[in-house]
Amino acid sequence: DLALTGCGGGKTTSEAQGATTDETTASTEAGSTADGAEAPDLNQDTKGTTITFWHSMGGVNGEAMDYLVNKFNEENTDGITVEAVYQGEYDDTINKLKSAQIGNMGADLVQIYDIGTRFMIDSGWVIPMQELINADGYDISQIEPNIAAYYTVNNELYSMPFNSSTPILYYNKDMFEKAGITEVPTSLEGILAIGDDLKTKGGAGEPLALSIYGWYFEQWLCKQGLSYADNGNGRDAAATAVEFDSNGGALNILNAWKALNDADVAPNVGRAGSDTATTDFTSGKAAITLGSTASLKQILQDVNGSFEVGTAYFPTIKDGDEGGVSIGGASLWALNNNDDAKAAATWKFIKFLISPESQAYWNAETGYFPVTTAADEEQTFKDNVAQYPQFQTAIDQLHDSKPQYAGALLSVFPEARQIVETEIENMINGNETPEKAVESMASQI
């Protein structure tokens, strides 16, 4: 079954979520579980209601967020005011929540990154999005299914997707042309095969600028159609152990990574946080890099026409791999403050944020996917794809994936990602073999 469900699938119960009895009882009394408890009554007078929204969007993305919040505050006729508060990194928001309590959470709506999903489900703090959807009769088919799949457990959507991205391959078309390469490689094997030509004929200082990033490791398991962890990738029940060691997936990834590094096709450029891989690419040193679809605008801006940027699907490990990609980014979680008027106001604001018009604007400004399918029909969206045809790659890759490649849910995902990155680094630095690195990952997570 796991071979079939590959990178996802499954259902959950409050027991499997790992919630303690107290948490489960508390959240049930507060009407905040998806397991048949009383949902909020959305038929409320929201005049004069103020809700607090915590988010982690800085820079250009932060400006786009402020624009949407201000637009809602000016245009909504329900007397609702949204106070948006920038929290810094996603980790900071989760840490701030840890000291909160039901009924007094400090915020009504929070933006939490993908790998915080299991933690939030288990917390007992939330009003599952499905309850608001059901109470309002909202048509959930409007949400892009491959995006919704990540945040869906036991057919319940727990949070509303908002800023979603997948990784893609970026390449320097001029270098490829100079090297006489007409076909863009679709696998790491394929990149290894053209590495020398990119250097000797294409003039690349490094063929592939590859950041050490746990997100890529997770994607390459999905690309092989293999699970990260047991219990249906932590979706049938809380994961108790990793499976990437026993199913061979991790070793395939590390062997391919080491081969690229040994051949000097992908030298060590450090971890993703350093941005070295991106700057190596935009400065014309690297022929290829991997990065988020949400980096497209920044990359094009930094290249500034000095060469033509091409985009392609995120590569597989081997040519025959047939898995898909999983979603990154973040989603919106409604917090339970035992206040139906605030819940109703929060839901109205969420509906505004995911409206086709808002999503087309958000996509054009940030490069994140529109999470609402109808956004594709908005002129803003069409104009943006016409201006940046590279973005079509991201849309096609998303549509070509399947909900079963939604990816794993782990309560310790942030820590697990750090461990994976440390062990890949150890391997690249020659401190351990790929086999030993996989063993170390599995024993620590």
Region spans (language model):
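Extracytoplasmic "Venus flytrap"/periplasmic binding protein-like
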Residues: K71, E75-I143, D174-T186, D280, ...
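Hinge/lid segment of periplasmic solute-binding proteins
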Residues: A30-D45, Y113-I168, L192, W220-K223, ...
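Extracytoplasmic/periplasmic substrate-recognition and gating elements
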Residues: E74-E75, T81, A179, N255, ...
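Glycine-centered hinge/linker elements that transmit conformational signals in sensory
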Residues: G195-D196, A239-G270
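Short, solvent-exposed loop/beta-turn-alpha elements that line the ligand-binding surface or hinge
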Residues: D41-Q44, Q130-I143, S227-N252, Q301-N304, ...
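A structural signal for short loop-to-beta-strand junctions that line the ligand-binding cleft
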Residues: S99-A100, D108, D136-M175, E206-L210, ...
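Periplasmic solute-binding protein
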Residues: I115-W125, Q130, N146-E183, L210-A237, ...
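C-terminal capping/gating helix-and-loop segments adjacent to ligand/active sites or protein-protein/ligand interfaces
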Residues: V325-S326, A375-D376, Q390-Q444
